[in-house]
Curated annotation (Swiss-Prot):
Official protein name in the record: Large ribosomal subunit protein uL13
One Gene Ontology term of the molecular function aspect: structural constituent of ribosome
Keywords carried by this UniProt record: Acetylation, Citrullination, Cytoplasm, Phosphoprotein, Ribonucleoprotein, Ribosomal protein, Translation regulation
Subunit structure of this chain's protein: Component of the 60S ribosome. Component of the GAIT complex. Interacts with EIF4G1.
The family this protein is said to belong to: Belongs to the universal ribosomal protein uL13 family.
Keyword field contains Ribonucleoprotein: yes
Residues with Citrulline modification: 59, 140
Length: 203
């Protein structure tokens, strides 16, 4: 990957810990990483057990002054961010710099809605979990422990998908017209095409 290039990952369908481990390694190596659709991240194990674990974590606080921490994030993006932070030496300068190279989002906000998103096969739920194993959605867990924007994120995602469908339809139409135009002019420019091919400009 070129220096300064941003790696945009789609979190949907990935396992929380596995994706976090890979992201942590990449940011330590100096790459900028953006993770979108964090609400679609999966956690292995059934939902009820995961919820009990998170509720137990919510009870961890400083008795004399809870505002001093630990801080319990409710948004899926922040839960994922905290998971990555736990895999970094975040109290050192190197770890802090690595953490600054990571951006996390619920849904797919602009400008990332127009960028190509990648997946990490080593962290995909369909690759890593047996089909019979239970799993939970991070978005649902977050919603049940206090995240208020599940409905808003879902609405914005629907709007984005509709826009993407329209854009894809237009793109297909343009490609069809281009092919037709090439066919129409093929006989006229045939000899020029042959010359370009002999010189290696066309394959």
């Amino acid at each position: 990957m070129a220096e300064g290039q941003v790696l945009v990952l789609d979190g949907r369908g990935h396992l929380l810990g596995r994706l976090a481990a890979i992201v942590a390694k990449q940011v330590l190596l100096g790459r900028k990483v953006v993770v979108v659709r964090c609400e679609g991240i999966n956690i292995s194990g059934n939902f009820y057990r995961n919820k009990l674990k998170y509720l137990a974590f919510l009870r961890k606080r400083m008795n004399t002054n809870p505002s001093r921490g630990p801080y319990h994030f409710r948004a899926p993006s922040r839960i994922f961010w905290r998971t990555v932070r736990g895999m970094l030496p975040h109290k050192t300068k190197r770890g802090q710099a690595a953490l600054e190279r990571l951006k996390v989002f619920d849904g797919i906000p602009p400008p990332y809605d127009k960028k190509k998103r990648m997946v990490v096969p080593a962290a995909l739920k369909v690759v890593r979990l047996k089909p019979t194993r239970k799993f939970a959605y991070l978005g649902r867990l977050a919603h049940e422990v206090g995240w208020k924007y599940q409905a808003v994120t879902a609405t914005l995602e629907e709007k984005r998908k509709e826009k993407a469908k329209i854009h894809y339809r237009k793109k297909k139409q343009l490609m069809r017209l281009r092919k037709q135009a090439e066919k129409n002019i093929e006989k006229k420019i045939g000899k020029f095409t042959e010359v370009l091919k002999t010189h290696g400009f066309l394959v």
